Amino acid sequence: MHHEELILTLCILIVKSASKSCIHRSQIHVVEGEPFYLKPCGISAPVHRNETATMRWFKGSASHEYRELNNRSSPRVTFHDHTLEFWPVEMEDEGTYISQVGNDRRNWTLNVTKRNKHSCFSDKLVTSRDVEVNKSLHITCKNPNYEELIQDTWLYKNCKEISKTPRILKDAEFGDEGYYSCVFSVHHNGTRYNITKTVNITVIEGRSKVTPAILGPKCEKVGVELGKDVELNCSASLNKDDLFYWSIRKEDSSDPNVQEDRKETTTWISEGKLHASKILRFQKITENYLNVLYNCTVANEEAIDTKSFVLVRKEIPDIPGHVFTGGVTVLVLASVAAVCIVILCVIYKVDLVLFYRRIAERDETLTDGKTYDAFVSYLKECHPENKEEYTFAVETLPRVLEKQFGYKLCIFERDVVPGGAVVEEIHSLIEKSRRLIIVLSQSYLTNGARRELESGLHEALVERKIKIILIEFTPASNITFLPPSLKLLKSYRVLKWRADSPSMNSRFWKNLVYLMPAKAVKPWREESEARSVLSAP
């Protein structure tokens, strides 16, 4: 007797568990603002009180780190037996969840969908069902998961309430198509929540026989290119057991390069009717495939329909006049734009180089072992008629190049200790400099500066250890005697000083800095000097 009761109890448990079957889904979609719960399949509560089966829950973050959930994690998240409940679920709850009992681990990815304010349901949570016309349409609103908490239930069609009783049982009509939403009102801890389940009902034609028919024109020409692969696609409206096949009207139809793709027959339902498509494949089209009938046929014992395809050589069209004209116009405009860009680059070459030096922080002075960035050669004697030249060399140049741009100049009167051998000292200082700046004037060559000039020219033109920058304080055409070697200097290394070039943004100073070595030293600036380099210090 005890054995029979045990078998009966087991049968009841099997039937009960079957009625509440559990399917594990790794991806779950829910809508924000509704109650939801997670429960692993195949785990039940302990049979005896002395058994321990502690369920632990974890939530993953974007950095794949997991934190354990508890009663303090959120007032909306509760634990009941082996269930993780959300009252309700919100957007911030989206993520990966893991349950663990001993060595048993289950995981889910929870995707929370934002509620559509203009609809009573979310498109991502809609299930679909096809119903044949004049067959039973049965819709019942049930939610066994919250059965004990549901207080009210409503049934909507396309978001309009249609029935006081949440149930439909009738013969389906085409007008019954639509979105049916069951809305359950659930109360929990004094708060009311709504749960929505929506199904999309599509009413289709009955499975009565239709007359088989090929879709589209009865004859179709298809342009092809020799050597290319081609596919012909034929579609038909038919019944489930109708014949549907390709045939070739050709004496030798056993070409292995022409194959009917039997595995890729595609079927679908449209307006309640069954449709299918078949593909005929050609590998590397040749002349033999052209102007031949390839027939697609659908048939049953009552009717037959055929469509013919003919392959013809595709004509390569000439370039339309407007396309040719447009292409030429684009080409001309591109050429003009390129020329303009080149011209602008030539005109603004100095500005572009200085900009590049500034952003790249290039420094050409780090590894050459030299002490000075430039040796300034100028008229040493300050007579009233040469005062402007002298002031320019010993005051203006250092104030701009040293204070504004961070260069280190060698000024003879400032940096040379008196009493040494002048010629040897000058030669040594020029060797330690990266540039030789010559301030050329009418009196320059008649002065002792001639020694500096000869030494610098030797370094520049013979040993190629230094580059010369010539500043014409007096136009060279007004100088009676000019060494031939100076005439060998490239024109861009000859700068002409004008009294109207006080601003540091003037072309003279930009060209001078361009000819100086690139240096990444951040200059020390005085705002007053930035306005006018000729102002008194």
UniProtKB/Swiss-Prot annotation:
InterPro entries: Ig-like_dom, Ig-like_dom_sf, Ig-like_fold, Ig_sub, IL-1_rcpt_fam, IL-1RAcP-like_ig, TIR_dom, Toll_tir_struct_dom_sf
Membrane topology: Single-pass type I membrane protein
Chain ranges of the TIR domain: 370-516
Disulfide bonds: 22-41, 120-159, 141-182, 234-296
Positions annotated as glycosylated: 50, 71, 107, 111, 134, 189, 194, 200, 233, 295
SMART domains listed in its UniProt record: IG, TIR
One BP term from GO: positive regulation of non-canonical NF-kappaB signal transduction
GO cellular component: a single term: interleukin-18 receptor complex
Domain notes: The TIR domain mediates NAD(+) hydrolase (NADase) activity. Self-association of TIR domains is required for NADase activity.
Complex formation: Forms a ternary complex with IL18 and IL18RAP. Within this complex, IL18R1 is involved in ligand-binding and IL18RAP in signaling leading to NF-kappa-B and JNK activation. Interacts with SLC12A3 in peritoneal macrophages; this interaction is increased by IL18 treatment.
Protein name stated in the entry: Interleukin-18 receptor 1
